[in-house]
Amino acid sequence: MLSAMSLRAIERLGIMVNNIFLLLLALAMLATKHVIFDFFLQTSYQRKNKGIYGHPGGLLHAGLHAAGTCSIFLVTTSTALIAVGIVVGEFLVHYHIDWAKEHIGYRMKWGPQQDAYWRSIGIDQWLHQLTYVGIVLVLATA
């Protein structure tokens, strides 16, 4: 599951490497990637247009997330088919979670001053994290 080079680097740090460690590392990498792409690198163009189905802004945002998901393959190994399936799945799920949140929020006219707005952000983030648990489960059973 771990590349030989990554395994040696981790073991030099005195960390005992096993499959549970690797899966937790992959999960931590996905969570970190999510914060970076959702809160630091997401542009106003992406944010404003995620609620319009098929808009390039939302597609770009989901595509960047999918590309960032490739980082887990630095510490794990899988077949090319599984890797492609994970990345495509991440793109599709991320896109539709974001679109649904934005679309519903727009239709309901939720803004930052309303509790429902903040709940929708919480549900959005929870669903994304569950997606990452799903990715790790795929890696664990592949």
Regions found by a protein language model. Give the residues of each.
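Hydrophobic alpha-helical transmembrane segments
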Residues: 2-142
